[in-house]
C-alpha cells in the first residue's frame, strides 16, 4: 500500500486505477443521477465554452460580460442557446421524479398534508422556471431585451424561491440527511445574497433586468463587471447546489421505468 501511495500521480498504474474508478462511479449511478449530471455538465460546458470562444474571438472582454451577452455573436451564441435549451429540457423529468419521490417520502413520514401541497408548489415553480429559462436562452438579448429580461428575472426569482420551498419540504421527511439540508440552506442564502449584490452594484440609473437596453449595445463590459460577477455566482451556486443535493435525492431513481 505504501509503495502504491508513493507512486507519482502520472504513473500508469495510478492512472489506470483512477480511470477504472471513474467508470465504476458512473456505472454505479442510477439512471436519474446520470440524467441529472449530464444535464448539469451540458449547462456548465455551454456557459464556460461560450465564454472562452467569445473572449478568444475578441467578441467579449474577459472581465466581464453578462451571461446573456454571450448569445450576441456566433459561434458561441449558437452553442450557448442550443446547449442551455437542451439542459432545460433534460431538467423537466428530473423535477417530476423529484416531486414523486418526495411525495412518497412525505406520506411515509406522516407529514402534515400541507407539505404535500408545498411539494406540488415546488414542482410547479420548477417547471415554470424551466419554461422561462428556455424562452430566455432563445430570445437573444440584443434583439428582444425586454422579453429576455422578464423571462430571465422570472427564472432567477423562481429558482431561489423553489430552493427555499425545497428546504421546507425535505425537513419534514424522516431521516433526511441534515448535512444535505445545511448545504441547501447555505447555497440558497448565497443565491439571495448574490441577487441582492447584483441589484446594488448596477450602474446608476440602470434597471438590473434591462441593463443591456439601458446601457446601449456598444457599452464596455467593465461598466457592469460587478453585477455580471454576481450573476455568474448565482448561476454556479445553483449548479453546485443541484449537484450536491439532487444527486442524493436521485439515488436509485429511474427517469424511465
Locations of regions flagged by a protein language model:
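Alpha-helical transmembrane segments and their helix-start/interface "positive-inside/aromatic belt" motifs
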Residues: 24-43, 181-190
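Transmembrane-helix exit/juxtamembrane "anchor" motif
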Residues: 55-56, 96-99, 168-174, 243-257
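C-terminal transmembrane-bundle signature of multipass membrane proteins
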Residues: 195-257
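Non-cytosolic membrane-interface motifs at loop->transmembrane helix junctions
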Residues: 143-155, 221-229
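Alpha-helical transmembrane segments in multipass membrane proteins, preferentially the mid-helix core
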Residues: 160-176, 195-204
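Short, positively charged low-complexity motifs
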Residues: 3-4
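Hydrophobic cores of alpha-helical transmembrane segments in multi-pass inner/ER membrane proteins
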Residues: 80-93, 157-168, 233-245
Amino acid at each position: 500500500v505504501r509503495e502504491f501511495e508513493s507512486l507519482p500521480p502520472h504513473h500508469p498504474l495510478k492512472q489506470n486505477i483512477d480511470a477504472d474508478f471513474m467508470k465504476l462511479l458512473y456505472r454505479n449511478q442510477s439512471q436519474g443521477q446520470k440524467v441529472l449530471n449530464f444535464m448539469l455538465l451540458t449547462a456548465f460546458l455551454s456557459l464556460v465554452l461560450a465564454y472562452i470562444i467569445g473572449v478568444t474571438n475578441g467578441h467579449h472582454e474577459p472581465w466581464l460580460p453578462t451571461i446573456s451577452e454571450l448569445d450576441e455573436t456566433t459561434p458561441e451564441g449558437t452553442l450557448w442557446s442550443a446547449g442551455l435549451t437542451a439542459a432545460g429540457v433534460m431538467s423537466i423529468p428530473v423535477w417530476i421524479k423529484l416531486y414523486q419521490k418526495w411525495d412518497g417520502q412525505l406520506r411515509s413520514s406522516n407529514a402534515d398534508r400541507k407539505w404535500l401541497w408545498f411539494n406540488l408548489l415546488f414542482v410547479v415553480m420548477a417547471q415554470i422556471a424551466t419554461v422561462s429559462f428556455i424562452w430566455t436562452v432563445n430570445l437573444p438579448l440584443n434583439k428582444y431585451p425586454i422579453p429576455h429580461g422578464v423571462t430571465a428575472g422570472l427564472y432567477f426569482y423562481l429558482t431561489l424561491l423553489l430552493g427555499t420551498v425545497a428546504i421546507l419540504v425535505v425537513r419534514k421527511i424522516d431521516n433526511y440527511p441534515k448535512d444535505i439540508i445545511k448545504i441547501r440552506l447555505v447555497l440558497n442564502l448565497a443565491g439571495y445574497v448574490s441577487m441582492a449584490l447584483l441589484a446594488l452594484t448596477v450602474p446608476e440609473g440602470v434597471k438590473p433586468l434591462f441593463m443591456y437596453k439601458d446601457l446601449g449595445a456598444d457599452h464596455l463590459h467593465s461598466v457592469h463587471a460587478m453585477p455580471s460577477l454576481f450573476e455568474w455566482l448565482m448561476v454556479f451556486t445553483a449548479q453546485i447546489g443541484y449537484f450536491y443535493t439532487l444527486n442524493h435525492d436521485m439515488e436509485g431513481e429511474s427517469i424511465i421505468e
